[in-house]
Regions:
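Nucleotide-activated sugar donor-binding and catalytic core shared by glycosyltransferases
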Residues: 2-10, 17-33, 39, 43-50, ...
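Conserved nucleotide-sugar phosphate-binding/catalytic loop shared by glycosyltransferases and other
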Residues: 33-84
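Conserved catalytic-core segment of nucleotide-activated headgroup transferases in glycan assembly
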Residues: 237-314
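Short gly/pro/ser/thr-enriched loop/turn and capping motifs at secondary-structure boundaries
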Residues: 41-42, 58-62, 142-148, 152, ...
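Conserved nucleotide-sugar donor-binding subdomain of glycosyltransferases
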Residues: 68-124, 176-218
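Short, polar loop motifs at secondary-structure junctions
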Residues: 36-41, 119-123, 231-235, 310-315
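Conserved nucleotide-sugar donor-interacting segment of glycosyltransferase catalytic cores
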Residues: 92-173, 221-222, 226, 232-235
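Donor nucleotide-sugar binding/catalytic pocket of nucleotide-sugar-dependent glycosyltransferases
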Residues: 212-214, 221-235, 242-253
Length: 447
């Protein structure tokens, strides 16, 4: 039995996709800890994992709720700092620089054999590797380096085989790099520079750190391999896959401990539409208007029915003229609802999209920010659904899009075919096999 520590970027969209893998490791007899902020402790323990506190004094329980309020009520630089988790990263870089820091001490005290750290937590990976611990980078995002005719994941460009597509992808990478520089200036923090300094501080080569469309990443290598929790079938074609990068299963947790959904108000004979903008719907400025647009669309379609998950910030009473065929909830279990869903309206979070594919549900995607435009583009590329603008779509246009996806059998056929690949990979569990091959028989760590 090995002791394994998982730590994910402090958002539900990163944490939840790791649960299936964590449970699979537990089922193999390993002891699995999660290193996380206090706000996630209860949810982590509910899934059956051990918990290690992370920055308990600086980010006590209740921090996430306070941050939600700040995000909803700020603009400009303050907004960018919050959604970029700048305060968290400042604390992380400061802590891992310290030789005898509490994170390192916790890892050594429990006899950690292997660390599975989010690709967005590269500072942790560098610290743990320097301490002699085995590390695997765990990516729920497709945050891969630049390649020919491979647009950055922050854009909604859908590539094709034309010379113009090659040029467009190259220009998009240039603009993406410029956008990162501007963001760094606005928030007053250069993540690429800080991560490079940290790498050299720990004795690694400066070129270990490379730019990417989202967060600067560690160059793929066999010393710190990267598991991408997304099947390669969903990605755009790449000229080659770099050594040390492994596309794996979608890692869909079908056994999350959540309240059972009440189906008494749902008519099994009507098409069911499920709408969610994820756990952080409040960070998208058009989200309130968008939710109302979806509700207005349903008012003219009594032959359809809708379940809408509003997220933690919005309340049902804030929306007007809600018809009887609409249920408004703050949170709903995707895994319980998707098997009965005809079409999903989503913000394009990679976790939600993977779940839709797994359950053969075509999509209408309205990407918010970060990497969501890139996943929406992949949905269009593979003909799994349609893409629209969250801030511009009208009720009439949305009805047309939903009609097209529901009535055109090609979308259902394409998503079902990819769903078969997803389920086959889930059963094969290549990530689990790769992780177990990395577990050391003997372990020597720096004190």
């Amino acid at each position: 039995m090995a002791t394994i520590v998982i730590s994910m970027f402090p958002e539900e969209g990163h944490l939840i996709p790791s649960f299936k893998l964590g449970k699979s490791l537990k089922a193999q007899g390993h002891q699995v800890y999660y290193l996380a902020l206090a706000d996630f402790e209860e949810y982590i323990r509910k899934q059956g994992f051990e918990y290690l506190p992370l920055f308990a004094e600086d980010f006590p329980k209740g921090f996430r709720a306070q941050q939600t309020e700040r995000i909803a009520n700020t603009r400009g630089r303050a907004f960018l700092k919050e959604v970029s988790q700048t305060a968290f990263y400042l604390k992380l870089f400061q802590t891992v620089h310290e030789d005898q820091n509490p994170i390192k001490r916790s890892l050594l005290e429990i006899g950690t054999d292997l660390c599975l750290f989010d690709g967005f937590l590269a500072p942790l990976s560098l610290m743990a590797r320097h301490a002699g611990l085995e590390v695997i980078s765990l990516s729920i995002n497709i945050n891969l380096p630049q390649a020919a005719n491979y647009p950055p994941v922050v854009t909604n460009i859908v590539p094709d085989n034309t010379p113009a597509s090659l040029s467009k992808a190259g220009m998009a990478w240039k603009f993406s790099g410029l956008a990162i520089k501007i963001t760094n200036l606005l928030i007053g923090y250069n993540f690429q520079k800080k991560l490079t300094e940290l790498a050299t501080h720990f004795g690694f080569s400066a070129d270990l750190v490379v730019p990417a469309a989202l967060f600067p990443r560690l160059r793929p290598q066999l010393e710190i391999p990267e598991l991408v929790l997304c099947p390669q079938a969903f990605d755009f074609p790449r000229p080659s896959v770099e050594q040390g990068i492994f596309y794996c299963e979608p890692s869909i947790d079908l056994d999350r401990q959540e309240a059972a959904f009440d189906w008494s108000q749902i008519d099994p004979n009507k098409p069911l539409i499920f709408c969610t903008l994820g756990s952080q719907s409040h960070i998208y400025k058009p989200s309130r208007r968008f939710f109302q647009t979806v509700i207005d669309t349903m008012r003219s379609r009594p032959d359809w029915q809708l379940i809408m998950a509003l997220g933690q910030k919005f309340q049902a009473h804030e929306f007007a003229n809600v018809p009887a065929n609409v249920q408004l909830l703050q949170w709903a279990s995707v895994e319980q609802i998707l098997p009965r869903t005809s079409v999903m309206i989503t913000h394009g979070g990679v976790g939600t999209i993977k779940e839709c594919v797994y359950f053969n549900v075509p999509m209408v995607v309205f990407p918010g920010n970060r990497d969501q435009p890139g996943y929406a583009a992949r949905v269009v590329y593979h003909e799994l659904g349609l893409m629209g603008s969250m801030g511009k779509v009208s009720a009439q246009a949305l009805e047309t899009m939903l009609n097209q996806v529901i009535q055109n059998p090609n979308f259902k056929q394409r998503v079902t075919a990819m769903g078969e690949e997803f389920r086959a990979l889930e059963a094969a569990s290549p990530a689990l096999e790769l992780i177990q091959s990395k577990l050391p028989h003997t372990r020597t760590v720096a004190s």
